[in-house]
Amino acid sequence: MVQVPYSRLTTLKDVTPDAESTHYVIYWCIAFKRTSYNYALQRAVEWANKLSQPLIILEPLILDYPMSSIRFHKFMMDGMKEVSQAVAKSKAYYYPFIETEPKQFDGLLKELSKKASVVITDDYPTYFVPQMTAKASGEIDTRYELVDSNGLVPIRLSEKEYVRAHDFRRYLHKNLEDFIVETPLEEPLSELIKDYDNSIDQSIEKSWKPYDFENSDIDAFLDELSIDKSVKVSPIKGGYKNAKNRLNEFIEKGYCDYAQYRSDPSKRASSEMSPYFHFGQISTHEVFEKIVQHEGWSPEKINPSLAGRREGWWGGSFNMESFFDELITWRELGYHTCVRRANYNQYSSLPEWAIKTLGEHSSDTREYIYTLEELTYSQTHDEIWNAAQNQLREEGVIQNYLRMLWGKKILEWSPNPQVALSYMITLNDRYSLCLLYTSDAADDPT
């Protein structure tokens, strides 16, 4: 079995696993919510095989995450159901725990880890995840590792912070060749040797009952759940199958026009993959691989003399160059920024020149000033902006070119830049399926 590269591993508790006194390996799945192209899951399988132990995949869904709503819950549960089906075909055991009251998950990881040799979880650099995984160190007494499966280049590889996309692109072009040939396994669970043997203490499953996806109605469950239902379920369906269907549709119909029309709201030339990326339901590696296969591209076509340029380095078509710049440069710059800058979502995180310019124009006369409520319900004089906000509120997405207009106009219509940023973050985090956390720090990937 191919080993997970050490550049993707962070050990939070460096304890030698004791296979004699423990029963299983745990993969605590919190960000990379998929069974394919997942380095974290692959690492868990690696440890389980090394120790001749079964694997438990623990995937919780807490109730009171920031801006929690039926929209996000439904999208995630659609994905969890498919994970449940995939794991059922393997030798692993899937333990989905969905809270019906806040804080119900508290204590479950601690109890399960008492008989675990190793606990593996996702190294996701933003939202509440870093704080949650760090806090868990106090509850876990065995070996505890974070594994990065965010993008093509490991997020902790660089020791330097990059602010400009051009500089980050040069850094990527210098390092990418090593990582585009080093990919996670397509189906890591197929490598698992040991069958699950009912080794979980039954008292644990009685206290924290796993959700039964096979015999439950997700919609009926959500109807009864005490959660914000004012943010409606999106017509965009979650899950790996829907992600793959959308990817295939994009390659067949939109990709050929991507470079020319991705910013045209009247065309459907963008990939629309962002929701699936954000919720970890599909991997950048898989999308990269599918585009490479479609193009018939190989690393021999790379032109090192064009390192740092937006076009030409890949030696591929115009569409491929453009798509990979969004998929890799801009998306991974977002992760990089969140790793290097803890205040990435605060006004103070902006570059000095930006803060200076915004400050100089903070007192400029504004023809229109709107409240957060007026913006929320599209009550402005601008029909195009209203349409973009309607799409965000009703569907959870905004066409990528209109999203830039959306943000610029909020800045123009707010009392000052600080208020504008707070409005953008509130609207974005409450409604958006695809722009949460990392991509806000840089730009949207696709």
Protein language model annotation of sequence segments:
Residues 365-366, 370, 374-410, 414-417:
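C-terminal structural cap/anchor segments
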Residues 437-446:
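Single conserved hydrophobic/aromatic residue that forms the stacking wall/gate
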Residues 105-198:
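Internal, well-ordered domain-core segments that constitute the primary functional module
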Residues 35, 43-55, 63-118, 123-131:
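N-terminal Rossmann-like or analogous alpha/beta NTP/dinucleotide-binding catalytic cores
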Residues 1-25, 30:
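N-terminal regions that are enriched for targeting/export leaders
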Residues 21, 154, 161-339, 343-348:
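Glycine/tryptophan-enriched, flexible segments
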Residues 322-388:
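Aromatic-anchored, charged helix-turn/loop surface patch used as a conserved interaction hotspot
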